[in-house]
Structures are given as C-alpha cells and as structure tokens.
C-alpha cells in the first residue's frame, strides 16, 4: 500500500494529544530529546500559520518517577501526589523546549467538568482563544491533583476531543504507541487489517476497540474511538498515529501509517446547528435596526444595540435575538446573565465596568456563539405567528 501523505498545514487549528508513554520512561524519566523534536514540529506548523494546542499526558507518570513510587497501580492519594510533583516538571519541560523556537507556552489544567458546565466552558474557551491570539501554545492537562473520578476513570483522549470541540479545531491528532485502527488486535490476530480511512464511526468500528496499552498510559483504542465520536460529530477530523518517531508530526505529513477519521461537516456548521436547534431558549433580547444590520454582516451583538431583555437566563444559556418588529432573527449564547444584561442594555461597551463593577466581555452575544435563523427581508406570518428560520451561518 502506497504511503498516504497528510499535509497538516491545510488545517487552521489543531489539537495534539500526547500519551504518557511517549513523554516519560519508567526508569529514566522525561524523554527530553523526543520532546525537543516534537516542539520543532509544532514550530514548523506555527510558521505556516497553523494554531496548535497540546493536550499533554505525563504528569502522573513523571511524578511517580520523580517520587520513586513503586510499579503497579497507584492509590488515589498517590496519584494526586504524583500529579502535583509531575505537573511542575512537565510544564517546565514544555516551556523550555518551546522557548528554543521563541514560542511561549501557556499552562491550562482542566477536568471534564470544565468542558461541560457552561460557565466554566466559556471561561476556559475564552482563555485558550486569547492565548492563541497572542501566539502562545496552550499546554493542557487534566487537573489530576484535585480530580478524583478523572484519575480513576478519565483519560486525555476524550479530554482532547472535548477541547477540540470547545475551541472549534478542525483536526485532532492522537499520538501514542498505537499507529492506527485495525480490524482486530494485530498482536493477537495475524489476519487483522489496518484501516487507513474511517468515513463514519459505526457499531462495527466501535467493536474493534481494545484495552489500555501500559501502566503509564490510561488510554487505549476504546477511548480513542470515543474521542473520535466526540470530535467528528462536532465537525473535527481525527488522526490516530504513532508518536514513537522523534518527529511524529513530520512523519504523518511524510506518509507514516495513520488512521484518518472523517468529520461530519465543519466545526462552525456543527456548532451553529447545535445552537439553532435548541428548542426552548432561556430568554430573548430585542435589538434595534442598526444592530440587526451589524449581525447580518457577521458582527457580534454589542450592548449598545440592545433595547429589551426578557426572561431569566445565565451566561452561556441559549437566547433568542429579536429584531425591531419582534421577529426572531438569530439565536446565540448569552455573554451575560439576564440581570447584568438589563443593566447594560443600550450602553456603550466602555461603560460596562462602571455599571457592573467589573470589566465584562465586550459583546452581549459573540458572533462565534450566534447563528442567524431568519434570512434578511423575511416577513412575519399573518396573525403574528413566526416560523422558525433555517440555519444561516
């Protein structure tokens, strides 16, 4: 079979998940030369205009090496102690290796709850987006020092998929000691076939998943397929590849064996379809004609264009946006609680801090969190009843 070249530079934003066994050796500790080579690959992508995020395993594995903990399963408190020690060493290692190419690393510790609870989700996304805007590479890991369920049952494959959907990435790369998906475990079945392209994750594909690879890694093919379901449903492609080569990303681009999972549409389309599909908006915001014009030209909704706030909703809830005639023209995720939104309605963004007592976000509803549900010039149904508009991204 001819090698399949996969140019990564065609993607806008890539999340790379790195397994523990790639970063940490049980006896010698951190694999510094591998990490340095990986950072060279990341720098090459950034030089081509690609935004890169890293979900890095290895804190517990590195910490247990530093603390000289015995081999085998760790108790919960031992895992948390290992994470506390290992996270410092891991962050320092990433920072030093990336700095060789004048790249600044930013550390973010998450739990799965941070990607599922709306307020924490929005805060985490805003921080990550700001780091990317500033040219930094976010280095993300589970907050294993305080998490309990995540340490015992969690994994960074699924966390990486949630991060990819949260930031609207168009590619997720899972690097470990597994080079892709086979129809059966190849070390058990010599007839196992390698699957290079997976158009859809079917029950048959799910049945091919296996178990964890080693005590240093909590992931296996099962969690990678689960991650694939999360990512591809949100419009993000996924690659499973071996990270064993010293330049794993360059190896993928050169045609090294890997499995590619096709996305379902684009990240923007998937996200906006979800927003438009919310059946019961928590509230509504009425806007003036000028704000409607701005929204239809692709801009965010600013407080100055808001005329009325209706309902009780929290930041991150889905709300309807009504034009001056009372017609729903868009839906989006609220940037403020209802009470705060009422206070700043009609006000300039520069006045927000003085009114609320804190410097909030500039937009009432950011354009990335909004979808137009009615085309320009649409008229209300006779009798005032409205038909829900189609998706207009």
Curated annotation (Swiss-Prot):
InterPro entries this protein is in? Answer: AceGlu_kinase-like_sf, Asp/Glu/Uridylate_kinase, G5K_ProB, Glu/AcGlu_kinase, Glu_5kinase, Glu_5kinase/COase_Synthase, Glutamate_5-kinase_CS, PUA
SUPFAM superfamilies with a match to the protein in the record: Carbamate kinase-like (SSF53633), PUA domain-like (SSF88697)
One Pfam family cited in the UniProt record for this chain: PUA
The record, for CDD domains, names:
AAK_G5K_ProB, PUA_G5K
Q: Where does substrate bind?
A: 57, 144, 156
Which chemical reaction does it catalyze? L-glutamate + ATP = L-glutamyl 5-phosphate + ADP
| Similarity section | Belongs to the glutamate 5-kinase family.
Instruction: Give the gene symbol.
Output: proB
Q: What is this protein called?
A: Glutamate 5-kinase
Q: Which residues form the PUA domain?
A: 282-359
Question: Compositional bias (Basic and acidic residues) spans?
Answer: 379-393
Name the GO cellular-component terms: cytosol
């Amino acid at each position: 079979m001819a090698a399949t070249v996969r140019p990564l530079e065609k993607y806008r934003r890539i999340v790379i998940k790195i397994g523990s066994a790639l970063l940490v050796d049980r006896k010698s500790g951190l694999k510094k030369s591998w990490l340095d080579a990986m950072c060279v690959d990341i720098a090459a992508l950034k030089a081509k205009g690609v935004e890169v995020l890293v979900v890095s395993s290895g804190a517990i594995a590195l910490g247990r090496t530093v603390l000289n903990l015995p081999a085998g399963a760790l108790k919960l408190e031992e895992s948390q102690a290992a994470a506390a020690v290992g996270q410092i060493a891991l962050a320092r290692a990433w920072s030093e290796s990336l700095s060789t190419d004048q790249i600044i690393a930013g550390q973010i510790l998450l739990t799965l709850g941070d990607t599922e609870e709306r307020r924490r989700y929005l805060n985490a996304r805003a921080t990550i987006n700001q780091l990317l805007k500033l040219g930094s590479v976010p280095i993300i890991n589970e907050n294993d020092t305080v998490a309990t369920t995540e340490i015992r049952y969690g994994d960074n494959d699924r966390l990486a998929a949630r991060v990819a959907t949260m930031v609207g990435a168009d590619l997720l790369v899972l690097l470990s000691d597994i080079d892709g998906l086979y129809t059966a475990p190849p070390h058990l079945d010599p007839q196992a076939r390698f699957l290079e392209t997976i158009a859809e994750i079917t029950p048959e594909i799910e049945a091919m998943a296996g178990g964890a690879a080693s005590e240093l890694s909590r992931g296996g093919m099962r969690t990678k397929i689960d991650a694939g379901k999360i990512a591809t449903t949100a419009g993000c492609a996924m690659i499973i590849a071996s990270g064993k080569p010293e330049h794993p990303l360059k190896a993928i681009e050169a045609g090294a064996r890997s499995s590619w999972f096709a996305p379902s549409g684009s990240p923007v389309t998937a996200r906006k379809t979800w927003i438009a599909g919310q059946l019961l908006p928590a509230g509504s915001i009425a806007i003036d004609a000028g704000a409607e014009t701005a929204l239809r030209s692709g801009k965010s909704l600013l407080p100055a264009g808001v005329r009325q706030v209706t309902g009780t909703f929290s930041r991150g809830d889905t709300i309807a946006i009504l034009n001056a005639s009372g017609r729903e023209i868009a839906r989006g995720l609220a940037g403020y609680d209802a009470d705060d939104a009422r206070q700043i309605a009609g006000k300039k963004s520069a006045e927000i801090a003085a009114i609320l007592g804190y410097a909030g976000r500039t937009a009432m509803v950011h354009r990335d969190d909004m979808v137009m549900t009615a085309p320009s010039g649409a008229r209300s149904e006779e009798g005032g009843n409205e038909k829900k508009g189609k998706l207009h991204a």
